[in-house]
Amino acid sequence: MEEGFRDRAAFIRGAKDIAKEVKKHAAKKVVKGLDRVQDEYSRRSYSRFEEEDDDDDFPAPSDGYYRGEGTQDEEEGGASSDATEGHDEDDEIYEGEYQGIPRAESGGKGERMADGAPLAGVRGGLSDGEGPPGGRGEAQRRKEREELAQQYEAILRECGHGRFQWTLYFVLGLALMADGVEVFVVGFVLPSAEKDMCLSDSNKGMLGLIVYLGMMVGAFLWGGLADRLGRRQCLLISLSVNSVFAFFSSFVQGYGTFLFCRLLSGVGIGGSIPIVFSYFSEFLAQEKRGEHLSWLCMFWMIGGVYAAAMAWAIIPHYGWSFQMGSAYQFHSWRVFVLVCAFPSVFAIGALTTQPESPRFFLENGKHDEAWMVLKQVHDTNMRAKGHPERVFSVTHIKTIHQEDELIEIQSDTGTWYQRWGVRALSLGGQVWGNFLSCFGPEYRRITLMMMGVWFTMSFSYYGLTVWFPDMIRHLQAVDYASRTKVFPGERVEHVTFNFTLENQIHRGGQYFNDKFIGLRLKSVSFEDSLFEECYFEDVTSSNTFFRNCTFINTVFYNTDLFEYKFVNSRLINSTFLHNKEGCPLDVTGTGEGAYMVYFVSFLGTLAVLPGNIVSALLMDKIGRLRMLAGSSVMSCVSCFFLSFGNSESAMIALLCLFGGVSIASWNALDVLTVELYPSDKRTTAFGFLNALCKLAAVLGISIFTSFVGITKAAPILFASAALALGSSLALKLPETRGQVLQ
């Protein structure tokens, strides 16, 4: 009996050992399968876990960052690293095994970062509850961020710079191009849209400013959300809002609905600049960041060139239109508005193929997601360089301890909108708190200085770039008025006028039994004249007025001579029949003036190309501050040449000069803003500063254009003073060249 019992016990122990070994191997196979499924970016059947038979050839690592660097002690003991096995004492798989994440108790011995620098703690010491209850001190969090920044920079160097970054460059370039297009759309369509929508001068002014107002709101909104919800997600939503309402604005008929659509379109595109620069910078190593962010700025110029070229090619084609009665009209300028939404639509489609920023994942404690994205970057670049066999060696990356999370409530608590309301309030509170932290003791001085630089730059740049075309139009008007023909005291009887009268003044004339049929009047004025027994039929006019005139027994049939065109005039026994329908306001429509707007904008945006190239090549060589201050000083000097601009050609040349030298300061300012703030505040601060930029633009445009036709001294003085102040403030900012991204 006793011998049989011993045999039975031995059999049971052997069965348990076999079952345990089978379970172990089955678990490893499952993990390998998961790793291959998750490794969709490398497109090769490579597993990060070595076969057990190969353990002697590939010893397990002793730390949590690299493979293939095991210790002799582990080999002799027959033990495998938790970083590669992922089993506890009971042979259970723990969460994160497939990512190669070391267990907490295994990370305390000899952990090191990707560049070999020592690093204390387990799993970054961030999620195991160390530190005082209720959160740790700010000094500890600052230390964590510095360690993460150093390790992240080393990982980006290992990933290299190649196909992935260039693909992302063109994708984000489309989003930046959409922002450049948005700035020009309203200005290009106004000469045509004012007739269809019957826009007064105040309506046109509001339409021009509403876009900047929308972009100001959008920059602050999407910039704040991108630090909480993610760069890619917020950029997709903001571009979707822009494209949807840009599409609607091409079809709506009323001024109010068009204004509303352009406002929301501006809100959508407002998130483009803050998110795009922050997003792209987090995939760039330190030695590439300044140059490639400057190359990215070129897409804003391409957006302006695209808008000007499309306006030139589409709007003058009046045949590209249709109408359904008098209620609905779709003219060529609406086609232009539709075409201007294409960059945003294409950017949305391309952005869906790109991953979220790994730096955002790490800042929010999402280690596994960040690892997968960085592995995608590494494998994409290595395949493109002809080294597909190179393996991404990093297995563990530091993450930041999260002290606050979005409030979650049970699904059966209240209604769905109450739950969403709670989450929205929580998110809004976090965004606002993050914004206020930009004015905390650590960043208050930087933020205030950056506010001054952004405001002065935007005030002078946008003010002058809008003032230039207005000055050109004023010079055109002065030249046009100098060629006005005056006909005094003429007497005309029994004559039929069926041609065009343009740029003429008729004073003291007498017209008896005359017929004005199919006549077109453009910038014609009749003063102190008499019309008796005359007949007006199918007459169209623009900028035409009858001042102190008398009409006796005169008939007006199917004309657009509305009441406001008769200034202090008397109509005795005169009749108006079937007046033309449409806008009763006097609009100039499209013509040479509109072509000049397209041409000037095209040249002005194209002129920044040399400045873009120079700034990109020198950004990492001379530094951000020297580039910003030097370009601002050169822009300030170029302002003094404006006093010599007394002709159209001279003003166009000065516009190109100013744009060419000022673009370098904008590029440097964008790079500096990205590098001065940490990753958890980057888009929030950038969005706020960009919103301030749009506010300064509105003020600059309003002030500068008020001096058109009065004096050139005031705009020159304001712009020069603002640029000088901005350059002096810029020199007091810290230089960020050569620093890792915080």
Swiss-Prot record:
The modification Phosphotyrosine is found at Y480. One of its GO terms (cellular component) is plasma membrane. Gene3D superfamilies: E3 ubiquitin-protein ligase SopA (2.160.20.80), MFS general substrate transporter like domains (1.20.1250.20). The chain crosses the membrane at residues 170-190, 206-226, 234-254, 263-283, 295-315, 335-355, 448-468, 599-619, 627-647, 652-672, 686-708, 713-731. Residues 1-169, 227-233, 284-294, 356-447, 620-626, 673-685, 732-742 are cytoplasmic. GO terms for molecular function: protein kinase binding; transmembrane transporter activity. Plays a role in the control of regulated secretion in neural and endocrine cells, enhancing selectively low-frequency neurotransmission. Positively regulates vesicle fusion by maintaining the readily releasable pool of secretory vesicles. (Microbial infection) Receptor for the C.botulinum neurotoxin type A2 (BoNT/A, botA); glycosylation is not essential but enhances the interaction. Probably also serves as a receptor for the closely related C.botulinum neurotoxin type A1. This is Synaptic vesicle glycoprotein 2A. It comes from Homo sapiens. The gene is SV2A.
